[in-house]
Each structure stands twice: as C-alpha cells, then as structure tokens.
C-alpha cells in the first residue's frame, strides 16, 4: 500500500507540472502559431473522443484548453486523487452514496455474493462519459447474467460556472445534495440500464476511488478486481468487457 500511495503522489506531481507546462505552451502558440495550437489541441481531443463526438465543434471546447478554468479544474482533480484508497487486490472502499430517491446507502451494499460489480463514475457535463454511455449500456445488456452495474454520479466535470464547454448540458456545480440528485435524474432519463446513485457532497466516493471526472472499476467479493485509468482518456468500457468475458 505504501508504494501504491507513493506512486499516486508522484503521478499527481508530474501531472500538475504537465498541466502548467501544457497551458503555458498552448497560450504562447495561440499567439505565435494559432494553426499549430489548434492541431495540438485537436490531437489531444482525439484521445478523449472530443473530435469524434458529433455534438461538439472545436470552438465549443478547444479554445478552453490552457485557460485558468482548465488549470483550476485539472489541478483540483489531481489534488482529489491524492486521497484514493481503491487499489487492485485491496479492499474496496465502502463509501456512502445516495439513491436518486434520497435513500442513503453505500457502494458495497450493491455487491451480491461473488458476482462482480461494475462501477461507472461520471457526470452529464463530462462529454466523453456521455459519448460512451451507449457503449456502457451495451456492456450491461451483454453481461447482465454475469455482473451487476452501478453508476455513481459525481461532481460536474464541465459545469456552466466552471470549466464550461459550449453546446453542453447546462448544469451548474452542485451546491447541495438536491442539486446533485437533480443532475443525476437527467442521466436517469438517458436510461443507463442500471441503478444510479450520487456521491455525497463531501465527494468522498470520488476521492477514495480517484474517480473525478470519470472512471471504471470492477469489484468482486469486497475487493477491487479492476481499476481503469483516470478519465477521460482512461475511461474504456472495452477493458471492462475483457474482464467480464473471462468470468463467463
């Protein structure tokens, strides 16, 4: 566990430095060579499915890269990741969550015997999360006989009062549990085919699972069986599919 936590701290420090250098570089290029800046941002967007998402144009999101809002949100994400406690082979954190009906429960209450539990963390304002919702729903359809699924709604990735994107869901950052529940109900309208719960306003689940802005896990018998890389680039339902296929 010590080495895992040390790696977390080193990774966060490296990512923070990367964010600062990237932002400075992009802002210089936007002045000296706008076309090159655009190419670099589009390349980064391709890795997180922004360029593949027909809902968004470059102007909706690309111009925000390197902004103060970009730096602030990315830095906050790295800071929250320092509190993670979910590691492969270790006990799964039984963090508290709230159902969309307002009932308080916890993540491990959704574990059933030896059946795997797939956790999908995200929010409506996270375009890669919503873009891959169809892929996630297909996972549910294909493996409902093998595993259970749970969506955990966390703080907004791109709230209208934060690092906002054009043509995105118009949701402000949650100020209360009711705000978060209201946002989660918008996701429920998209029928994720599994239960949806929300993180507490302390963001305890997002912290313990390092799940901001999005992340995938597979739990089994109280342990972490699979831990996807941090989103948006690491949110890969195909990796979960590979894990579940081995359990048939």
Swiss-Prot record:
This enzyme's EC code(s): 1.21.99.4
Transmembrane domains' residue ranges: 7-29
GO cellular component: endoplasmic reticulum membrane
Enzyme active site: 126
Membrane topology value: Single-pass membrane protein
InterPro entries named in the record: Iodothyronine_deiodinase, Iodothyronine_deiodinase_AS, Iodothyronine_deiodinase_I/III, Thioredoxin-like_sf
Swiss-Prot/TrEMBL GO biological process terms: hormone biosynthetic process; thyroid hormone metabolic process
Source superkingdom: Eukaryota
Expressing tissues: Expressed in liver.
Catalytic function, reaction form: 3,3',5-triiodo-L-thyronine + iodide + A + H(+) = L-thyroxine + AH2
Main subcellular location of this protein, as a coarse class: endoplasmic reticulum
Subcellular localization: Endoplasmic reticulum membrane
The entry's keywords: Endoplasmic reticulum, Membrane, Oxidoreductase, Selenocysteine, Thyroid hormones biosynthesis, Transmembrane, Transmembrane helix
A GO MF term: thyroxine 5'-deiodinase activity
Pfam families in alphabetical order: T4_deiodinase
Task of the protein: Responsible for the deiodination of T4 (3,5,3',5'-tetraiodothyronine) into T3 (3,5,3'-triiodothyronine) and of T3 into T2 (3,3'-diiodothyronine).
Family: Belongs to the iodothyronine deiodinase family.
PANTHER family: IODOTHYRONINE DEIODINASE (PTHR11781), TYPE I IODOTHYRONINE DEIODINASE (PTHR11781:SF22)
UniProt name for this protein: Type I iodothyronine deiodinase
UniProt source species: Fundulus heteroclitus (Killifish)
């Amino acid at each position: 566990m010590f080495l895992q936590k040390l790696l977390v701290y080193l990774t966060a420090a490296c990512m923070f430095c990367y964010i600062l250098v990237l932002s400075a570089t992009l802002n210089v290029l936007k002045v000296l060579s706008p076309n090159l800046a655009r190419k670099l941002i589009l390349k980064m967007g391709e890795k997180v499915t922004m360029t593949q998402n027909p809902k968004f144009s470059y102007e909706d999101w690309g111009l925000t890269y390197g902004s103060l809002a970009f730096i602030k949100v990315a830095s906050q994400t790295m800071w929250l990741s320092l509190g993670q406690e979910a590691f492969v082979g270790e006990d799964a954190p039984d963090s508290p969550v709230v159902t969309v009906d307002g009932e308080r429960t916890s993540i491990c209450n959704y574990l059933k015997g030896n059946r795997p539990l797939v956790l999908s963390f995200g929010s409506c304002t996270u375009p890669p999360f919503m873009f891959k919702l169809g892929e996630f729903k297909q996972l549910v359809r294909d493996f409902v006989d093998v595993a259970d699924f749970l969506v955990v709604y966390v703080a907004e990735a791109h709230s209208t009062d934060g690092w906002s994107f054009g043509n995105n869901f118009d949701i402000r950052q949650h100020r209360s549990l009711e705000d978060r529940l209201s946002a989660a109900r918008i996701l429920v309208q998209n029928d994720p085919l599994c239960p949806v719960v929300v993180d507490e306003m302390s963001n305890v689940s997002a912290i313990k699972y390092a799940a901001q802005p999005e992340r995938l896990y597979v739990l089994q018998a109280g342990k972490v069986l699979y831990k996807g890389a941090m989103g948006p680039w690491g949110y890969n339902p195909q990796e979960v599919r590979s894990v579940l296929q081995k359990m048939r």
